[in-house]
């Protein structure tokens, strides 16, 4: 996996205006850690073809060099999503957030502070915690080790890539660990409707992430759909159509 060779424009911020009766409904799609906007572009194109206004931002530290992810503070991830949310709300009557992996934790953190602006949250294999004893010492480890092997491109469908980094930046992981702990504490505050997709064969995240979110989130309107034929980056995998269509119905019913 590497960002070289990505389709032109797929590693940049992407925005498209809506059309027809859905033109005033916006969808903000947030990619995962070490991933890129490319992992959300087909999803965004599908929704835009249905008339929805879409925004797929580059989360700071991504879509450039993996070393850049060792230089950012977690707050910049939240700020980027918040900025895009506020911009969408200027022209949209309803706004929904879609988060993949860490993009899920990122979306939840921001949504907790902006429930007046968010009408629904769609999560695809979301990350809300990192289990294991070693992660507690990641800040110390990051002082002597800059990176580890990549955890990206966990995709069952052959020949598909998310155009992310080919290394796992350790200082970036330390920031991610801090961020997810804060995001988890906010879960009980979130009353927004939630649709969560979970791959039963996910090699990147433990199922406890899904269980924690569904158990601890404050929303009474929450749905879970299991994906039987996809790995972690399910938005690019065999079950993508299931995600796209069910997300469309979720948005349609609430707008």
Question: Which residue ranges define each predicted feature?
Answer:
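Catalytic active-site module of serine/aspartate enzymes centered on a nucleophile-bearing elbow/loop
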Residues: 228-255
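Catalytic histidine neighborhood in serine/cysteine hydrolases
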Residues: 211, 215-233
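Short beta-strand/loop motif that positions the catalytic acidic residue
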Residues: 190, 196-198, 202
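Catalytic nucleophile-loop/oxyanion-hole region of alpha/beta-hydrolase
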Residues: 65-91, 96
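Gly/Ala-rich beta-loop-alpha elbow adjacent to hydrolase catalytic centers
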Residues: 99-103, 107
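Conserved alpha/beta-hydrolase "acid-adjacent" motif
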Residues: 203-209
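Active-site nucleophile loop of the alpha/beta-hydrolase fold
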Residues: 122-132
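Short, surface-exposed "cap/lid" segments of acyl-processing enzymes
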Residues: 4-65
């Amino acid at each position: 996996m590497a960002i070289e060779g990505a389709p032109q424009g797929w590693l940049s911020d992407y925005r498209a205006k809506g059309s027809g009766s859905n033109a005033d409904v916006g969808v903000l799609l947030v990619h995962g850690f070490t991933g890129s906007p490319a992992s959300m572009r087909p999803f965004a194109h599908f929704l835009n073809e249905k008339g929805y206004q879409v925004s797929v931002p580059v989360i700071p530290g991504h879509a450039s060099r993996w070393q850049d992810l060792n230089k950012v503070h977690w707050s910049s991830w939240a700020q980027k999503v918040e900025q895009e949310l506020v911009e969408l709300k200027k022209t949209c009557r309803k706004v929904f957030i879609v988060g993949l992996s860490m993009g899920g934790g990122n979306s939840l953190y921001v949504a907790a502070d902006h429930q007046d602006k968010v009408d629904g949250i769609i999560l695809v294999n979301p990350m809300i915690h990192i289990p294991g004893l070693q992660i507690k010492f990641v800040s110390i480890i990051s002082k002597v080790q800059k990176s580890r092997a990549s955890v990206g491109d966990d995709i069952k469908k052959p020949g598909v890539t998310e155009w992310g980094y080919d290394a796992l930046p350790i200082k970036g992981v330390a920031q991610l660990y801090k961020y997810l702990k804060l995001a988890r504490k906010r879960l009980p505050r979130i009353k927004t409707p939630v649709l969560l997709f979970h791959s039963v064969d996910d090699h990147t995240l433990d199922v406890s992430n899904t269980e924690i979110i569904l158990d601890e989130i404050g929303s009474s309107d929450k749905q879970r759909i299991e994906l039987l034929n996809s790995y972690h980056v399910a938005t690019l995998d065999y079950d993508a159509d299931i995600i796209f269509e069910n997300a469309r119905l979720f948005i349609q019913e609430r707008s």
